[in-house]
Amino acid sequence: MEAVKCEAFLAAAELGSLTATAELLGYTQSGVTRMIGTLEEELGFPLFLRSKKGVQLTENGKLMLPLLREVVRAHHNAEQLSAEIGGVSKGSLTIGCYYSISALWMPEILTAFRARYPGVTVRMQEGGNLEMARWLNERSVDCCFGAQMHGDKYDWLPVFRDELVAWLPHRHELAEADAFPLTRLQDEPFIHTSPNHDTDQDRLLEQHDLHPQTCFTTRDGFTTYNMVEAGLGVSFNQRLISRKWSGTVAEVPFDPPQFVTLGISVPSLKEASPAAKKFIACAIETVTGGEKGL
C-alpha cells in the first residue's frame, strides 16, 4: 500500500472533490482517480460515494480514515528520520493554534523555524479548544498551541502564563480601577465570545459558577473588543490577545486575579516526528526567549 495513494485519499476525504485534490497535490484529476481506484482495489471495497457534486466517504471509508492517516504519518516520519540521518532536515507539519496565537506568536515562530529548517513545510490550522481536541484525537495535526485540553489523552508542554483581564468601555466607572470584582460579571451586560466552545471564557465562567447577562455573542475576540469599545457591554480575555490592537478599551485585572496557561498539546511526544520535535523546540525557544518555559 503506497503512501502516495493514502495521501490522495486523505486529501479527497477532506476536500470532498477529486479536482481540488489534484490541484492541491499537483496531479491531474485522472491521476488522482487512478490512485484512489487502485487503493480501493487493494482494499477490496469502495472508499467514496461519487456524484457530480464531488465525493463523500462510505462507511468503510470512514473506518479506514484514521488507519490510512497513520500509514501516511509513519511514512513521513520514516522520510524525516532518514533525511536527518543523512544530515538534511525535511518534511511537512500541520500545526493547530488559537486565533490569537496565530496572529501574535506564529509569524515569529515560523520565521525562525524556516530559517533553520527550510526543507520543512508547515501548514497552519486556526481553531478553538473543541476543534483542536478533535484534530489531536484524529491525529490530523502534529501539535496544537492553546490552553491545556481536558483529560490526559495528550502530552502537554506548558509554555506561557497569561492573565485574564476584564474588558471595559473607557467610560465605565471601573475603567481606571485597580481591579474588577469577578462576581460583577453577572451584573453587567456581557459580550460572550464563542459560547459553548470550551473557550477560556467558558472555562472561567463554569469554574466560578458565574452566569452573566449575555447581551451579544461573537465569533472572535476582535469583534468583542470593538463592541466593548463602543460601549455595548463588558467582556474579558487574555492580555496577550489585544497586545497589538489600538483602542480605548480598559483592561482591568480581576479580583481575585485569574490566569490561563498556554502551551503545546501533542498526540504523543514520544511518537512525534523529528520535524515536529524540532518545531516544538523552536517554538518554545522563540516564545520564552531561550528560557525553558513554565
Spans of model-derived segments:
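Short helix-boundary/capping micro-motifs
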Residues: 11-28
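A short LG(V/I)-centered, amphipathic sequence patch enriched
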Residues: 40-57
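Alpha-helical linker/hinge and terminal dimerization helices associated
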Residues: 42-43, 64-86
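Flexible hinge/capping segments at coil-to-helix
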Residues: 86, 153-164, 168-190
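Central regulatory/effector-binding core of bacterial HTH transcription factors
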Residues: 90-152, 217-218
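Hydrophobic hinge/microswitch elements
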Residues: 128-133, 137-140, 147, 196-250
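Beta-alpha-beta core module
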Residues: 153-158, 162-163, 177, 223-271
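Secondary-structure junction motif
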Residues: 188-209, 272-281, 290
